[in-house]
Swiss-Prot record:
Pfam families (alphabetical): IspA (PF04279)
Purpose of the protein: Plays a role in cell envelope biogenesis, maintenance of cell envelope integrity and membrane homeostasis.
Transmembrane region(s): 20-40, 61-81, 86-106, 123-143, 156-176, 187-207
Compartment(s) of residence: Cell inner membrane
Keyword Hydrolase carried by entry: no
Name listed for the protein in its UniProt record: Inner membrane-spanning protein YciB
UniProt record similarity statement: Belongs to the YciB family.
InterPro entries listed in its UniProt record: YciB
Keywords noted in UniProt: Cell inner membrane, Cell membrane, Membrane, Transmembrane, Transmembrane helix
Keyword Cell membrane recorded: yes
Species annotation: Mesorhizobium japonicum (strain LMG 29417 / CECT 9101 / MAFF 303099)
Amino acid sequence: MNPPILERDPSDPQKEKKEGVNPVLKLVLELGPLLVFFFANARGEWLVQKFPVLGEFGGPIFVATGLFMAATAIALIASWLLTRTLPIMPMVSGVVVFIFGALTLYLQDDIFIKMKPTIVNTLFGGVLLGGLYFGRSLLGYVFDSAFRLDAEGWRKLTFRWGLFFLFLAVVNEVVWRNFSTDAWVTFKVWGIMPITLLFTFSQMPLILRHSLDDKASGEEKAGK
């Protein structure tokens, strides 16, 4: 049987047997396109001097957008080659990057690439909270079986991440509408990631309280 293109359901026992990507490599694949975007925007004129063909894109933000799209495609292809699956979040984000990036380049209007984080985070937040409304905790797809939680743990974590994504959408709107393009790019790369890491670490107490692995380990010790 051919492997699934998308990630398996978190409750699928076969998913637990799947070898994940090396965490460092996974981080590189996720952060790589953002770093390319930041560098290309900061050194856009230099890049055009070295590679005149990039001048066809327009100013630095448009050069950065074109290279961001290319880097995103490479990251998704690399993920597929390494795991034979496409992680849900990077895949959805990639689709939005291609659509809004294409609009940015075609119309020569950077408003589209600036709105991309708003659209993606609103979509993720809406899907997670909407799933809870219908009794489904969908965050297991996002975390790719990094850990196993009980039902209550997944509900709480899904709710918190849903609100966090909506918060990121609002923050992006505030920043791009009130600050320069360079400031927005810098915040997108060096602001959003630290905020996300801090939020992630702040959820560890909840994860530990509801971890099925810890409960199984405790029961195993009690049985000895």
